[in-house]
Amino acid sequence: ASSGAHLTKYSNVTDPVAGQKLLIVDPAITPDAALFDYSITESVPMGTTLDGALDGIAHTFEAFCGAKSETYELLQKLAVTCLDLILENAPKLMSDPTNTEAREALGLATDLGGYAIMVGGTSGAHLTSFSLVDLAAHGAACGIMNPYYAVLYTPAIQPQMKVIGRVLKKYGFAAPDTEELSGRALTEAVAKGLIAFGKSIHAPTRLTDLDGFGEKHVQRILAAAKDPSLSMKLQNMPVPMTAEDVVPYMESVIRGAMDGDLSKILIKE
């Protein structure tokens, strides 16, 4: 399990031979209380810390993109606060790994991510990440995929893209005119902003950035997406899908993410 696991009903089991992760979802594993001393993260590699940050963004971003009317306001606050904390403090921590305040900020941000997925839920990027366990850490895999899935979700997430675009612009990762855009142009501008942040912390931003990625992973991803045990991720997408939609729609996302080409992604109206 990755960031926020100490707060949530989610865990997982990974088959290292098949290279596939599967979910455990049960309210019984939600703790009555949790204690996280963020200072213990000082001893872990910087890559692990930043992977947690990427996972925190993924949790709040995916939950916010899938928000219903009754949860929209709360998930917006969680997404904006999480992004603010991470975009401001990740660069500080890279410059000074002993910066206690920056480390605590990232810890709080990822805790908000855990809260977000208890209110909403994750979707496409998390689903794909489960098939990349032999190549990438969880947060990095989600961080690669969310910009590309956002384009797929374009018709359903325009208000969310305006909000996320504002935060990215605040930290110099999105163009000044992002909020004036609409439709696919807006979503692609936000996607490019998320990719720019990933590059700024030296994270992979394309599937081909992962050493060893190949066609077998594409087929593994598509096969897993059709697995009934993971159907909740398809159904939880802002543009809900079934196994029959995996090809061509989800496949177009994977092909686009392979070489960083947003134009390859098909949109399901």
Where on the chain are the PLM-derived regions?
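Catalytic nucleophile loop
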Residues: 1-4, 138
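Hydrophobic packing residues in well-ordered alpha-helices of helical domains and bundles
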Residues: 79, 103-106, 161, 187, ...
